[in-house]
């Protein structure tokens, strides 16, 4: 039960952070392209890869902290379902190039962010 509460609390924090990040991006860039979700998913991929790499490299990283951060906070922060819906919305608006760009930017950006975080954490760990 304690682990479930850790995930739920982390999820609440991550969801709040996603809302604030997306709201900021909407104010900063406008509604013409889903920059907020792209920012959330790419930065979330970076953070999740960093968390997982650090937790697997160090015995001092408590499993409950990994659960709270990875499944909870990052699970609440990132949003695959919004990414899919927004891609579909762009397609339905006839914005094929924007949909393709969003799809590629998300998939490649998230992968690049995960690789960068993994390499950074390994480098910092020595």
From Swiss-Prot:
UniProt superkingdom: Bacteria
InterPro entries assigned: FluC
Keyword match Aminoacyl-tRNA synthetase: no
Main localization (coarse): membrane
Keywords assigned by UniProt, alphabetized: Cell inner membrane, Cell membrane, Ion channel, Ion transport, Membrane, Metal-binding, Sodium, Transmembrane, Transmembrane helix, Transport
GO cellular component assignments: plasma membrane
Gene Ontology biological process terms, A to Z: cellular detoxification of fluoride
Membrane topology term: Multi-pass membrane protein
Catalytic activities: fluoride(in) = fluoride(out)
Single GO MF descriptor: fluoride channel activity
Transmembrane regions: 4-24, 36-56, 67-85, 101-121
Positions that bind Na(+): 75, 78
Activity regulation note: Na(+) is not transported, but it plays an essential structural role and its presence is essential for fluoride channel function.
A Pfam family assignment: CRCB
Family: Belongs to the fluoride channel Fluc/FEX (TC 1.A.43) family.
Matches recorded under PANTHER family: FLUORIDE EXPORT PROTEIN 1-RELATED (PTHR28259:SF1)
Free-text function comment from the UniProt entry: Fluoride-specific ion channel. Important for reducing fluoride concentration in the cell, thus reducing its toxicity.
Record-given protein name: Fluoride-specific ion channel FluC
Originating species: Anaeromyxobacter dehalogenans (strain 2CP-C)
Organism classification: Bacteria, Pseudomonadati, Myxococcota, Myxococcia, Myxococcales
